[in-house]
Amino acid sequence: MTIMQGRSTVRQSPLQPGDPAPDFVLPAVDRDGTVSLADYRGKAPVLLAPMRGLYCAFCRRQIAQMGFTRQKLRALGVEVLAIVATTPERARLYYRFRPAGVPLAADPHLTTLRAYGVPHRALTPEVSQIFASRLSDLAHELKIPATDINEIQSALCRRDGYEPTQTDEEDLQRHGGQFVGQFLVDRGGIVRWINIEGAAEGEAGVGKFPSDDELLAAARASLGLGPGERS
């Protein structure tokens, strides 16, 4: 199954290790043309990281982190692809001035998140409060001297050089309470490892991204790599 931009097959539960990973064709952000899972088939395993839109401070931070993580995973022979849920034009504008250091694709309609079965909840006041609480935790971690959620969001935006646009607001309203995940897919197109936001820790896991050590350990274990081995 190949997912084209704007067309979505919705899974009711996340893909599991051993499942075939649905292919996709999405606009590239860091270069011209498109990017697909088929680009990696037969060549290298790839860590896929579909994110929310640029409005998400956690996702902006995680994509920046992946620029460093990528170098460590490539030493194991593993490629990385981040997918940001906004229009290619919006993503290119933001990352033109803040290069991510990782290959990027744009998926404004959440086709990959839905096809890979990543949970989605309506953006109820309760769900909004979960995200607000985690933003407060992030502000504390970054030593941002603010307690009001609007002040925290503004401070995080300034820190990232991010100015919200109408496109971002439309993305937020359309996406609702979308969670994210990471999927390690081998060169044969089979899922070998997954991590779903909040699955292990509940609300405390919202906004968290695996550490480099966790990702490297997952790559070695799921791909059967010994010390010093590459995929």
Q: Which stretches of residues belong to each language-model region?
A:
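N-terminal "domain-start" segment that seeds a small globular fold
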Residues: 2-38
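Short, positively charged
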Residues: 4-5, 155-166, 220-227
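Short loop/turn microsegments at loop-to-beta-strand junctions
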Residues: 22, 47, 179-181
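Short active-site neighborhood of thiol/selenol oxidoreductases, capturing the structured segment around
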Residues: 35-67, 79-80
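Catalytic metal- and UDP-sugar-binding loop of GT-A-like glycosyltransferases, i.e.
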Residues: 50, 83, 185
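Structural microenvironment flanking redox-active thiols in thiol-disulfide oxidoreductases
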Residues: 62-115
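Thiol/selenol-based redox catalytic cores and closely related redox-interacting motifs
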Residues: 107-202
